[in-house]
């Protein structure tokens, strides 16, 4: 068998059309969703990500602000900038582009962002809400994975999902979202002994470790769904994921490519979260006016 390719770019475009309608509805009420991105230093990859976010905002008719800060900025100065954005009513989402310089604590910066404007879904309050099944801003990559599976009509209830990776950004929250959707979840990581023993049992494998060829055809069972979150370069300098795509696609039922797989979904869900924040802000304004 040859797997069906899950085209993240096409699914992201379909989701963006829905978001565009929501932005239009808000703009008719003279309310424009606003996203502020803080970029510290001049990391080239970070600059590319930020440009993509700015373009997505512009394409959807959203307001975006880019705040560039030097790499020698102090942690206190960065927190002051975040505080200003927390108070700014025209901004509904705040994102500090990671990674940060070594002298700045990512944990402290994430916690400085108001949970109501934490559209990355990294704040401990949003993580706690997600874990307890409450309404929350969901981390964008795991959120995008769930939306992709929904779009192809794949129901994860009762399925065994193996997450390879345990980062706070992808691995851990992805497992939680699958658990919330009634899947049985197993986590594997760098200290897992005999990775294939676990992944071969999986109906769904999510590879999120940042190391190419982590998942080969020997790691999956026939007909598994394979989601590749990795972003690496091969020997020719071409983008590739954590999955040995060419061999795994002949055994899987569905597989995401790299690029044009999970990547486009991440920024799309960031836009979705920002619009959701704006909708909540408008509701709060209406409630305040009534009272």
What label would you give each PLM region?
Residues 1-31:
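Positively charged, low-complexity intrinsically disordered leader regions
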Residues 2-6, 10-11, 264-291:
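C-terminal helix-to-coil terminal segments
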Residues 42-54, 136-225, 238-246:
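Glycine-rich phosphate/diphosphate-binding loop of Rossmann-like nucleotide-binding domains
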Residues 57-71, 185-187:
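Short beta-strand elements in bilobed, periplasmic/extracellular small-molecule ligand-binding domains
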Residues 77-89:
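Short, well-structured alpha-helical segments in soluble
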Residues 96-156:
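Anion-binding alpha/beta catalytic cores of soluble intermediary-metabolism enzymes, centered on
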Residues 99, 209-211, 230-231:
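Short glycine-/small-residue-rich Rossmann-like dinucleotide-binding loops
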Residues 107-123, 127, 230-281:
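Rossmann-fold NAD(P)-binding glycine/threonine-rich loop
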């Amino acid at each position: 068998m040859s797997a069906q390719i899950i085209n993240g770019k096409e699914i992201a475009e379909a989701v963006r059309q829905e978001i565009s309608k929501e932005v239009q509805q808000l703009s008719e009420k003279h309310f424009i969703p606003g996203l502020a991105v803080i970029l510290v230093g001049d990391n080239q990859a970070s600059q590319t990500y930020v440009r993509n976010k700015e373009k997505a905002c512009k394409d959807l008719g959203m307001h975006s602000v880019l705040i560039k800060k030097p790499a020698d900025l102090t942690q206190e100065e960065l927190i002051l900038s975040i505080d200003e954005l927390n108070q700014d009513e025209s901004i509904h989402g705040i994102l500090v582009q990671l990674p940060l310089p070594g002298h700045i604590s990512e944990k402290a910066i994430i916690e400085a962002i108001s949970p109501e404007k934490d559209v990355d879904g990294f704040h401990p309050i949003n993580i706690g809400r997600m874990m307890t099944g409450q309404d929350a801003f969901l981390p964008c990559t795991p959120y995008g994975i769930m939306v992709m599976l929904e779009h192809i009509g794949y129901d994860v209830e009762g399925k065994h999902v193996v997450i390879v990776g345990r980062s706070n950004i992808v691995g851990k929250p992805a497992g939680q979202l699958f658990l919330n959707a009634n899947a049985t979840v197993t986590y594997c990581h760098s200290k897992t002994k005999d990775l294939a023993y676990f992944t071969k049992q999986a109906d769904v494998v999510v590879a999120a470790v940042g190391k190419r060829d982590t998942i080969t055809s020997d790691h999956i069972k026939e007909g598994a769904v394979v989601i590749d979150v990795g972003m690496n370069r091969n020997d020719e300098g071409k983008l590739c994921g954590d999955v040995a795509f060419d061999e795994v696609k002949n055994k899987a039922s569905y597989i995401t490519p790299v690029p044009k797989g999970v990547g486009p979904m991440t920024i799309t869900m960031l836009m979705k979260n920002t619009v959701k924040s704006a909708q909540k802000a408008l509701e709060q304004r209406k409630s305040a006016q009534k009272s």
